[in-house]
Amino acid sequence: MGKPGISLENVKYNNKSEILKMLQKNGAMSRKDIAVHMGLTPAAVTLLCNAMIEENIIVEKGELQEEKRAGRRKVLVDINYDCKYIVSVSIEAVDTWITVTNIKGGDLASTKIATDTIKSPEDFLKDLTKEIKILLWEQELQLNELLGIGICIPGIVNRKKGISIHAYGIWDDEVEVGKVVSEYMQCPVIVENNVKAFAEGEMLYGAGKSGDNMLFIKWGPGVGSAIVIGNELYEGYQHNAAEIGHYIVEPNGIKCRCGRHGCLETRVSISALAERLKNEYSEERTPQLYKLTNGDKEKITRQLITEWAEVGEEGYFAQMDPAVENVMSGAVERMARVAVNVMTILAPEHTIVFGPMLENTHIYKLFMEYCREYDEHYTDEYIHRSKLSKKISYIGGTALIARTYFFENGGISKKE
């Protein structure tokens, strides 16, 4: 028996996928322009687009005057981003965010629950699915309107199996997150490391649309990173890759939650900074901080430091006590040094930084100064702050589902 040829059905779905990716990248286009970009006949593209309109995947969106042809207008088509909805879940050590979005990453509704680490992971995940169902009910959405659920979690994740291998600060053992959630929700579930998921969000919705090889660095509450090579997330052996938070910066240093000693996180995570500031704390050495906390150093928490970072130019970081500035400058220098070392090894086209610490203008400016001190080529043209930072709690989970079950799938009909 001869080798089977390429299925015409697969060709159709591949072409649909290419159309969706093109519209996602360029916005509304005419059938004629799509045909030119894809190298297909206008008739073939018209058939594809008409089928996608019938499936409610794309919609016609007005007209555009053709150049050089008076009176002739192009009818534009664009993605119907509301044809299905996505639930994005971001599990962090303290809180878990649940957000309903459309395929474009538009936020419809969200809720926040405490990440209960006292309960078993399975019981917590059952509670999570109940909250998801409540949120969907409040939005009058049925399960069949859901494209899938994207779950982002810190630490090491086996995406293929939907398993959290080690969620630092949340669960120490393996948890079959995908299996538990999909059993209760009866829909596709993708589980991924939070930084890798955010990188997918950037590739689909942000600066990553224009670059093939990139490095992503997150600071706050811990330190995370992800590598994109050839527009694909790089995954190393045993699902480890670019764990710069666990780069050794202090031999025989403080024990890290990963089990090693002297990791970058032990010096610069927000929890580590809170402990170091407590050690510096006194009315004489830190008068402003002393006044701010009413003489109670136990008020120096991860939440307080995060609030300082989020306030911006008017916050405490802009007018720190000298002793506090010493601590913060040391942390920023370490972050910059490790970032420069990683950029030197990987030589990405761009580095995108995000997270509450690097969103703060004062901290980011200092970070860039240290980067340029080590290498003058590391300017704002090479290192960018993410424009999606305000969507950090959901854009990664949305991208996981949208990319896999919509853009790579030629829409929704193949799965259904």
PLM feature segments, named:
Residues 102-103, 159, 228:
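Short, acidic, Ser/Thr-enriched surface-loop or helix-capping motifs
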Residues 154-156, 221-222, 357-358:
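Short glycine-rich anion-binding loops that position phosphate/pyrophosphate groups of nucleotides
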Residues 76, 86-90, 146-150, 214-218, ...:
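Short glycine-aspartate micro-motif
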Residues 1-61, 66-71, 76-112, 117-137, ...:
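ATP-binding/phosphotransfer module of carbohydrate and carboxylate kinases, centering on a glycine-rich
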Residues 106-107, 163, 232:
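Residue-level signal for well-ordered, solvent-exposed loop/turn and beta-edge residues enriched
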Residues 110-112, 120-124, 182-322:
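Glycine/GP-enriched mid-protein hinge/lid loop-to-helix segment characteristic of carbohydrate kinases
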Residues 110-213, 362-373:
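Glycine-rich phosphate-binding loop and adjoining helix at the ATP-binding site
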